[in-house]
Amino acid sequence: METSIACYSRGILPPSVSSQRSSTLVSPPSYSTSSSFKRLKSSSIFGDSLRLAPKSQLKATKAKSNGASTVTKCEIGQSLEEFLAQATPDKGLRTLLMCMGEALRTIAFKVRTASCGGTACVNSFGDEQLAVDMLADKLLFEALQYSHVCKYACSEEVPELQDMGGPVEGGFSVAFDPLDGSSIVDTNFTVGTIFGVWPGDKLTGITGGDQVAAAMGIYGPRTTYVLAVKGFPGTHEFLLLDEGKWQHVKETTEIAEGKMFSPGNLRATFDNSEYSKLIDYYVKEKYTLRYTGGMVPDVNQIIVKEKGIFTNVTSPTAKAKLRLLFEVAPLGLLIENAGGFSSDGHKSVLDKTIINLDDRTQVAYGSKNEIIRFEETLYGTSRLKNVPIGVTA
């Protein structure tokens, strides 16, 4: 028998929201639960309840050891539900990732049908007309609230902790960039959503390595949901089918060497001679330039093509813009779970402690040799020099 997930479909009031406030903790965005439920249902492309696949339909690949069955590998063609049943035993995490998947498919539709004028791209959210990035923000907060497993959440648009009403013990905290690249929606470039999931009730004093999952929603010619679950090998791509379901279409476990580069913040080459030298190397060695100005597609291509490097370097006059919590750390987990490497110039971005919600950093993602070149060119040495491929430093 199918079991409904507590996400959008039940209309049950979430646990009471704390009224306590601090400088970093505020109450959630003011939603009327019943009306927001209706708005979300009407905003969805399909409006169907999410369902867990019957156990009899799960296609787990198993290996027997001492009489016990252990899932060792997922299968291409699985549904998102089937994959998550293998990827993690945590029902709460499965519910959260399913709810976020529902929000992503709705955002994809809203981005695709947005009206773009001279200053913004807008679409409807119930009776409101909102810029698509704010609409995405609201949808994601609602998804987390209705998951009933999210304690705190914050976003680039609302960079303060929002109490989602979930439990501390066994619950999660989520940070997200609702629509990375929103300024290029009107040009019809690919844009996307980024989010990271941490256990418990903290989004500061933690590292990217503490994440239990991270994901991107990618809205381009295809709509995909790319996710990584800590402890489960690979980074996995799900395609949104016409009937509104997510189907597993790709597993990436290795980022190989290949001449493809995506250089962000090139204005930093003006007064960062080392970065200028690195860019000159790519040009001299005839690397293929693949850069859109959207971080989601520029990093996603490394996972899909299984090669290349993305850089966003700072200088005295071109300061860091990328946020560690909302963008850099989640993408770091996606890249490293896929067999790649990340760096701030000295160490993996997953090893950087998030002190403030707005912490920013430079970053590079790519294959091992590309990250070695990045670190050596900018700082003269690399921690990865003697690290075997497949081992995270």
Swiss-Prot record:
Induction field: Light activation through pH changes, Mg(2+) levels and also by light-modulated reduction of essential disulfide groups via the ferredoxin-thioredoxin f system. In etiolated seedlings, induction occurs only after 8 hours of illumination.
Pfam families: FBPase, FBPase_C
GO annotation, cellular component aspect: apoplast; chloroplast; chloroplast envelope; chloroplast stroma; cytosol; thylakoid
Record-listed Mg(2+) 1 binding positions: D127, E156
CDD domains attached to this UniProt entry: FBPase
Keyword Nucleotide-binding attached: no
Primary location class: plastid
Transit peptide segment: 1-74
Metabolic or biological pathway, per its Swiss-Prot or TrEMBL entry: Carbohydrate biosynthesis; Calvin cycle
Catalytic activity, as annotated: D-sedoheptulose 1,7-bisphosphate + H2O = D-sedoheptulose 7-phosphate + phosphate
Keywords, comma-separated and alphabetical: Calvin cycle, Carbohydrate metabolism, Chloroplast, Disulfide bond, Hydrolase, Magnesium, Metal-binding, Plastid, Transit peptide
Regulation of its activity: In continuous light, by inorganic phosphate, sed7P, glycerate and ribulose 1,5-bisphosphate.
Binding site for Mg(2+) 2: E156, D177, L179
Database matches in Gene3D superfamilies: 3.40.190.80, Fructose-1,6-Bisphosphatase, subunit A, domain 1
Annotated S-S bridges: C116-C121
Enzyme Commission number: 3.1.3.37
Ranges in a coiled coil: none
Gene Ontology molecular functions: metal ion binding; sedoheptulose-bisphosphatase activity
Tissue spec. comment: Expressed in all tissues examined except root. Highest levels found in leaves and flowers.
Disordered, as annotated region: 16-36
Subunit structure: Homodimer.
Protein name: Sedoheptulose-1,7-bisphosphatase, chloroplastic
